[in-house]
Amino acid sequence: ISDSSYNIDEDYMMRPWDIIKELESDNSRLKKEAIIRRESDAENIEFFNGVGMALDGFRTFGIQKVPTSKADGKGLSWERFAYVVNKLEKRELTGNDMRNTVDHMCENATMDQWNNWYRRILIKDLRCGVTHKTINKHSTIKVPVFECMLADDSKKHEKKMVGEVIVEPKLDGVRVITICD
């Protein structure tokens, strides 16, 4: 199925919160993929930077409760939001200062902007049926993914088990991985 069958204008770059609403409005996997390709082709950097912030498990903001906007503000620029998120990631903004800053951003942003875009980034859930796998498969801009390598069952490779070998039992359980910066 081509992107044109979904009436997607490839020359028009949408605002990120409108893209999220478009993605959540349809359950069609093919349409979601077409939308991701359209935005990738349009090089919608703001959209993919926000998606990266939301879907990258290595990026944490240290915020538990993010308010929902109930009134329109004058609008919040992406640059201002990204600046504050950077401070949250580095833990330069914590406690009451963090809460007050997030509340201030919520008041300044439009309801659409905040509830459908910025808030979803902070809670790390875009709620539109798109995962990092979809983004990475259909976009030139990738979201970092970390997956733990699992052990293979040797029963599938019995012919390779010749000569002297060192064998350890395959155990199921919790893996602990430490990342030192």
Placement of each model-derived feature along the sequence:
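N-terminal nucleic-acid-engaging modules of covalent nucleotidyltransferase systems
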Residues: 1-181
